[in-house]
């Protein structure tokens, strides 16, 4: 059995009933869908922090998690090293080829940055050994510039220069680790890069400091030969009242303002989209059309609760819309994947639940891929959209698109059109039928799986 009292998770399809929770019903890693293997479309990654560090605490109670390494180690460094073995066996039994981590997820902090880096390097040594022996790769790493109390007012936006300097030193070593481990991406999530109250905040100054920080990071990455794609992860709020990377559109505006569009793409999360008042599909479409889709965090929120819940994704409608966008793009960014930034519920506390929850998420996205592939094969959305905007393919509409129209030419065209003709020019969306069509594709595609 190994360190986990569970066998490698098999693909069973319809061989077992729908209640079998320790097998894949839709995720068949090597199955070719829309010209690529499932595993290559989805590129699943496991999040170290939720999977191996999360104790399932909530604001009203202590942790309920039961993990096989609990109670075995009195020294945090020994436990950190042991968790590397548990992690890589978990990845292999789940059949996942990527993982992600924050620097402070994998090793305990010391009193100084020098001590902390030393602790970190010991664990990185062991991670590197396991990566070489298993072939498992680092989708992305990042630096935790929000958990320690020193970051109470931010890191790159902190009003305290000593904290800014510490953040820079911490980030420098994190980039060196990315280089060493061959990270395909590097993520910046500004958990406390925002404000609690505008009265004591110089917002422009803080954002300028953050932009300078990002440019320093890019300069150092070039210096050491790190070619990982830099990613910003937008989030509207939590833990701050307002974060500067509120949503995809806000982050894109920041990148354009500070000459960073050629450096960064976006890492988008479903639950974060909800916190900004958007759907996951909206955020992905916004990034795609700006050319900055980088990677995805796979989770969902509860639509009735305005919190960052980090639930495992089980909403097939949402996974289908996400994968429709991914297939339209051709990939999840240049080097992106689907990282499960998700944790089991507090009542799902056994070690086995870590497998069950990841299986649920992986199957949900595999099912979404099958639905999206069928929709793209039939060009149902492409044809619908082409018909809706067809008036811009010729006549006055074509002059708008080719740039020859002017207000004068539009006026001349419209002056004598009666209202009856204008109303006649509009067409019904048949929106309810469109929504029903999506449902029908979900049912039909999964029935054929």
UniProtKB/Swiss-Prot annotation:
Ordered alphabetically, the record's keywords are: Carbohydrate metabolism, Cytoplasm, Isomerase, Magnesium, Metal-binding, Xylose metabolism
Q: Which GO terms describe its molecular function?
A: magnesium ion binding; xylose isomerase activity
Annotated Gene Ontology cellular components are: cytoplasm
Cofactor requirement = Mg(2+)
Q: Which reaction does it catalyse?
A: alpha-D-xylose = alpha-D-xylulofuranose
Coarse class of the protein's main subcellular location: cytoplasm
Against Pfam families, the record matches this protein to: AP_endonuc_2 (PF01261)
Q: Could you describe the subunit structure of this protein?
A: Homotetramer.
What processes does the entry annotate via GO biological process terms? Answer: D-xylose metabolic process
- Which subcellular locations apply to this protein? Cytoplasm
Task: List the InterPro entries.
Answer: Xyl_isomerase-like_sf, Xyl_isomerase-like_TIM-brl, Xylose_isom_bac, Xylose_isomerase
Q: Which gene encodes it?
A: xylA
The entry marks the following residues as binding Mg(2+) 1, namely 233, 269, 297, 341
Q: Which PANTHER family match?
A: PTHR48408, XYLOSE ISOMERASE
Origin organism is Bifidobacterium adolescentis (strain ATCC 15703 / DSM 20083 / NCTC 11814 / E194a)
Chain positions recorded as Mg(2+) 2 binding sites: 269, 272, 308, 310
Protein family per UniProt: Belongs to the xylose isomerase family.
Q: What is this protein called?
A: Xylose isomerase
